[in-house]
Amino acid sequence: IWCSRRLNIRCLERPCNRIVSAAESSESPSWTRAQVLRDPWFYALLPGILAAPFIITGILFHQVHLVETKDWELQMFTSCYPLYAISATVVSLGAGPIIDRFSAVYLLRFYLVPLALGLALLASTDAVFAAPAFMLLMGASAGGATIMLGALWVELYGNKHLGAIRSLGVSLIVLSTAIAPGVMGVLIDVGLNLNSQFGLLAVYLCLCVVVFTLMSPSFLVERRPPAQV
């Protein structure tokens, strides 16, 4: 009886082994962090990926100067923060199924559009309605980025070294947020007011959207990592 049970167990194990092997062989190639650093497409992505955290941090840091420039009440502006949170939450929940159905690469070309519209609005008017509208648009881009970036690295570079690659991306994002207040402050000091900065940043984000759109077809094709040195 023991021998027959052992034989049955071994027979059941063999197909599973074959299935696992087939799954392993069909996996897309995974890149190491060193290989990612040698990928020119990674550096082409960075100006757009780092733009949103840079801009959002800079604006929130200089919010007092912003409301003084617009002749708004600081209390009114800060009361709009719940709109930012609601927008970011709703878009985050909606972005997940979109990525599941299409891909993070598909979403890449869209997630900066709300922030670009919000900056264009701030640059063009001092009306009070611009504050809540901007918070909603900024939250939409922030929520989309939170979900999209987590999936993008997997789609582009595989999941075997995901921790190392994500840590690289997060480190660069932290660096961009750290320098944003200083850069925007220096520009204010040299005479480039916030409205002008918002207009330039809106144009910059539109260029990033165009670049992402042109790059997306290349990302949909499976790419092999360069040989390790």
Regions found by a protein language model. Name each.
Residues Y106-L121:
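Structural signature of the two symmetry-related core transmembrane helices
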